[in-house]
C-alpha cells in the first residue's frame, strides 16, 4: 500500500468513526432522555406506555445500526471467508419479499417479483444482505400506494437483479453517492423511515466482494431502478 492509498484509507477510517459516533449518539440520547423523565416521575401514568414504546423503538433502531456497522466492518475485512453454496436467486428473493411483506403492507406498497430461476454459487448470508437491503430500501423510500418490481434474470451468463420503485427519485448529483456510508439524500425522510444510512453501502460491499457492479437509473417524481450485476 503506497502513502497516498494509506492516507486515503486512514481518512476514510476517521470519517467512518466520526459518523458512527454521531449516529449512535442520536438514539442513545433519546433513550436516556425518555428514561430520565420516567425515573423522575415527570411522565403522567397514562403516558408511560407511550414513553416505553418510544424507548423500545429507539432501542430497535440502535440495534439495527450496530448490526449494520458490524456487517460493514466484516465486509471491509477482505480475509473473511463466507462460504459458498448453490442458491436459486429467484426463490431466495421470494423468501426476502415474504419477510418484508408486513413492512410493504404498512406502507401500502405492492411488491411484484418475476424472473428466472438463476443458480449462483454464493454465501446465503451475503445474498440475504444484498436482497434484504435492496428490497427494504425500495419499500421505505417509495410513495404511498406505490409499487416495487423485483426481477431476477441472467445476462451474458451472470445473474442480474433489478429493483425498481415508484418513489420520489434521486437527484442526478447524488446518484453516485447513495452507496456511500451514512449518506442520505433526505435526512428528515430517513429519520422517519428508520434508515441507518448503511443499507446501500452494504449492498455495494457485497457486489464488489463478488466482482460485480451496480447501475442506477432514476427520474425525479417517477422512481428509481437499481440493477445489480454479479
PLM feature segments, named:
Residues 170-184:
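Short conserved segment of the HATPase_c
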Residues 39-46:
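Short acidic helix/loop segment immediately C-terminal to the autophosphorylated histidine
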Residues 83-101, 152-153:
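A conserved beta-strand-to-alpha-helix junction within the catalytic ATP-binding
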Residues 57-62:
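Short alpha-helical segment of the dimerization/phosphotransfer core of two-component systems
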Residues 103-113:
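Short conserved segments within the C-terminal catalytic ATPase subdomain
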Residues 77-82, 115, 119-125:
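Conserved micro-motifs of the catalytic ATP-binding
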Residues 211-212:
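Conserved glycine-rich
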Amino acid at each position: 500500500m503506497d502513502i497516498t492509498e494509506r492516507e486515503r484509507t486512514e481518512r476514510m477510517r476517521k470519517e467512518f468513526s466520526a459518523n458512527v459516533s454521531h449516529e449512535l449518539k442520536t438514539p442513545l440520547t433519546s433513550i436516556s432522555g425518555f428514561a430520565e423523565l420516567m425515573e423522575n416521575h415527570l411522565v403522567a401514568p397514562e403516558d408511560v406506555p407511550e414513553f416505553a414504546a418510544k424507548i423500545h423503538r429507539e432501542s430497535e433502531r440502535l440495534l439495527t445500526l450496530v448490526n449494520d456497522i458490524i456487517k460493514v466492518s466484516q465486509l471491509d475485512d477482505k480475509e473473511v471467508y463466507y462460504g459458498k453454496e448453490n442458491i436459486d436467486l429467484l426463490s431466495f428473493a421470494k423468501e426476502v419479499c415474504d419477510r418484508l411483506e408486513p413492512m410493504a403492507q404498512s406502507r401500502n406498497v405492492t411488491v411484484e417479483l418475476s424472473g428466472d430461476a438463476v443458480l449462483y454459487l454464493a454465501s446465503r448470508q451475503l445474498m440475504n444482505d444484498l436482497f434484504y437491503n435492496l428490497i427494504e430500501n425500495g419499500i421505505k423510500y417509495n410513495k404511498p400506494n406505490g409499487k416495487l418490481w423485483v426481477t431476477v434474470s441472467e445476462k451474458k451468463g451472470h445473474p442480474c437483479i433489478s429493483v425498481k420503485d415508484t418513489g420520489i427519485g434521486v437527484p442526478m448529483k447524488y446518484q453516485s453517492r447513495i452507496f456511500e456510508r451514512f449518506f442520505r439524500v433526505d435526512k428528515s425522510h430517513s429519520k422517519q423511515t428508520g434508515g441507518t444510512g448503511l443499507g446501500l453501502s452494504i449492498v455495494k460491499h457485497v457486489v464488489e466482494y463478488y466482482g460485480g457492479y451496480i447501475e442506477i437509473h432514476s427520474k425525479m417524481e417517477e422512481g428509481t431502478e437499481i440493477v445489480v450485476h454479479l
